[in-house]
Amino acid sequence: MKKIDINILGLGNLGTAFFEGLRKNKNLNLYFYEENEKIRNDFAKLHDVITSPHINTLDSGVLILCIKPQNINNFFESFSKKINKDVLIC
C-alpha cells in the first residue's frame, strides 16, 4: 500500500494536535511547515522531525491548514500556484 502524504501547515495547538493523532499511523508520510522559527525549531527538537518554513511545491496528498482564519487569503495568494489541483486541502 502506498503511503499518503500529509502536510501540516502551522504547528501551534491545532497542528500539534493533528500530529499527535496521526504520528503512529505507519501508512502516512508526515511533513510539517511553520513560518515562526522558534515554534518550528522547538517542534522539531521535541518530536524529532524535520520541519520547513514554507511549502515549495505539493503535487499530491493532503494539506491540513492549521492557520488563523484571517491568514487564509494571504496563504492562498502566496502559495496557490505551488499546490497541485490534486492536493486535498482541509
Task: Please provide the spans of the model-predicted regions.
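Short glycine-aspartate micro-motif
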Residues: 8, 88-89
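Rossmann-like NAD(P)-binding element
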Residues: 53-88
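NAD(P)+-binding Rossmann beta1-loop-alpha1 motif at the extreme N-terminus of oxidoreductases
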Residues: 1-53
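Hydrophobic/aromatic residues located in beta-strands of well-ordered beta-sheets
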Residues: 30, 89-90
